[in-house]
Swiss-Prot record:
One matching Pfam family: malic
Protein induction: Induced in the presence of malate via the two-component system MalK/MalR. The regulator MalR binds to the promoter region of maeA. Is not subject to carbon catabolite repression.
Native species: Bacillus subtilis (strain 168)
Descriptive protein name: NAD-dependent malic enzyme 2
Designated gene of the protein: maeA
Reaction catalyzed: (S)-malate + NAD(+) = pyruvate + CO2 + NADH; oxaloacetate + H(+) = pyruvate + CO2
Amino acid sequence: MGYYLTWLTISRKKEICLNNIKKTKEGHLETTLRGKEVLSIPTLNKGVAFSLEERQELGLEGLLPPTVLSLDQQAQRAYEQFQAQPDRLRQNVYLSDLANRNEVLFYKLLKNHLREMLPVVYTPTVGEAIQEYSHEYRRPQGIYLSIDNIDGIEKAFENLHATAGDIDLIVATDSESILGIGDWGVGGINIAIGKLAVYTAAAGIDPSRVIPVVLDVGTNNEKLLNDPLYIGNKHERVQGERYEAFIDAYVKAALKFFPKALLHWEDLGNKNARNIMKKYNHEILTFNDDIQGTGAITLAGVLAAMKKTGASIKDQRVVIFGAGSAGIGIADQIRDTMVLAGLSEEEANKRFYTLDYRGLLTEDIEGILDFQKPYLRNADEVKDWKRDEKGQIPFDEVVRQAKPTILIGTSGVSGAFTEEIVKEMASHVDRPVIMPMSNPTHLAEAVPEDLFKWTDGKVLIATGSPFDNVEYNGVSYEIGQSNNAFAFPGLGLGSIVAEARIITPAMFAATADAIAEMVDLETPGAGLLPSIDKLQEVSIQVAIAVAEAAIKDGVANRQPEDVKQAVLDAMWTPEYKKVIAK
């Protein structure tokens, strides 16, 4: 038998849970707890679904209404309660409370209504929950690590009372760049919790084997610093050597206690995200979802477009409008796939044109960041290109001269893909691939309806934000959303199943290709990315492909004979276990 753990609530209840609940070989839960204590543990509590026999053995008689309901009946009632909430923030709070009251029921409800509830537990509503975190705070969830107490990091992990094999996945954020809303300090724990909920709903990652972590290094958000109810560190955000030492202490402690765990980084600032990737990506099992996850799902859209047009990835010319971490992360993954298709890395780099607030990035521009350097254009190559009053090569001139086949926006500049620019691109490409990736919706570089109109319906689109179908010339076009939820759950599950030591470029490419393979290429109007209704199906295929790629790359410590079965066996499902009184 082994301990059965929950990481949604770290409190005194945790110690009760750890000391008094065990999972039997048959999959039952065995406990010494009785009465109200049983009802207080979210992994143990079934509410009115406890059988009459369980109620007698566990001391629950008289503590519950007499009727026994099934999990399905409970889920029906919970859905009615969810629908009765006045807005999405209240729905988020309701689901959070449910998760901390009855974990199985929460995931059953989420699985039953994934399309409707994913935007509530994850982006965009989780952004509202993060902003209101200190005012909506009810109970601790996860691990809170403070830069002002580096020496306490190991103690925090020790306080979980978990063994080395108990944890598969840790999602951590320093909250500097939360979604599209910026720096929100300790409230960023909610993005880690939301991410883990998606891991479980999409890929069946066991919720008892994960930990959400917030790395509290302070905040530069004046609203939080001036808020008397703010519960995070009330000082400006720490950077530099002290920040790096804090991150290093976290990584060392996490892997000391849980050496096989996948470390997922979420919503770090650009500079820190890149530095952490550079330091750890080739040493441990880790990835940054904002950079590498976004790159994988965008690459999936590109590969699906190639399948639709019959074109080769290595022949594409790509303009990236927004050369920050996300934009360059996308470029890196497309570039790596071009290399796998036969180009040299130098040849592949030359297929890209990257822009930021300085216009086209060229070798003679000062202040270029290291991660941007592979894609700089030679100054002599563009010496005759038109420049604006600042001496910069503007976006419209890049499109005119480079004649891109793929246009990707990660700028957060609403409406940047103007009619003039889009029509210029469409004039030299049979099927322009245009991907306005910025989110939320009001920051998108273009709206799909305009893109169809400006290209006479030739465009192939994927977006970063959700958009309704577009009706054009009698066809309803589904707009595929480049939602990282299609990528990171399966990537994580596949890495865990293979016990991968690191995540290789081929594993990211396998993620993208598996997603692209799930796209409907035959139905008129089908999107470049799968429907969210296929999220679990996609995640399973991604996990299989990732595990196989890890084995092929020689980075897997486990090589199951039947990878598909190993993936399916590893998936947790929201079903009540029999609870036995010990």
